[in-house]
């Protein structure tokens, strides 16, 4: 995270958290602006020893499902648009996002498929309301491919090729979704 922040990365670092844990996780980001300011005031070792204020923990769902990722191979939005979207983030958006992340974790731990689908869909709607530019045509195709299947999908990430993620609740739906994503390119 330190190196990415130093290079001006705008992301939540959720991708790094997933890579570090190699698991389905609950992740709440640190205050990136606060850490950037600390980077200018203290050396690396001191900064790394400090509490960055993030939360991360593995989630063990009580429901069998596949976690699928479809990569668009193209950024959803440019760095300028990322900054515009970032400036549009309101306390209401952040509160709504936190509410959905917490509800999703609870639903996963309880094995409540309907609540999982509802939370993912509401999180997707929050992103779309924040900026329609987030859902490029390719991301819309990835998301819409899940409709009518026993799964739910949403956009995830911004940068060098955005992703659609999906939770699929049966093998047939997983196979159909993967095929639809492959056919879409």
Residue ranges, per PLM feature:
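C-terminal nucleotide
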Residues: 2-10, 14-158, 165-185
């Amino acid at each position: 995270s330190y190196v990415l922040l130093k290079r001006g990365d705008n992301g939540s670092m959720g991708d790094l958290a997933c890579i570090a844990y190699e698991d389905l996780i609950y992740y709440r980001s640190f205050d990136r602006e606060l850490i950037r300011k600390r980077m200018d005031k203290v050396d690396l070792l001191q900064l790394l020893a400090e509490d960055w204020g993030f939360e991360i923990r593995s989630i063990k769902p009580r429901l069998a499902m596949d976690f699928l990722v479809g990569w668009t191979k193209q950024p959803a939005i440019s760095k300028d648009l990322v900054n515009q979207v970032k400036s549009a983030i309101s306390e209401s958006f952040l509160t709504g996002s936190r509410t959905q992340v917490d509800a999703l974790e609870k639903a996963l731990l309880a094995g409540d498929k309907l609540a999982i689908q509802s939370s993912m869909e509401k999180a997707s709607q929050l992103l779309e309301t924040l900026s329609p530019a987030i859902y490029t045509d390719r991301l819309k195709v990835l998301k819409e491919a899940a409709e009518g299947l026993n799964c739910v999908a949403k956009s995830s990430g911004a940068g060098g090729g955005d992703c659609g993620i999906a939770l699929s609740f049966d093998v047939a739906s997983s196979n159909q979704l993967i095929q639809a994503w492959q056919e879409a390119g």
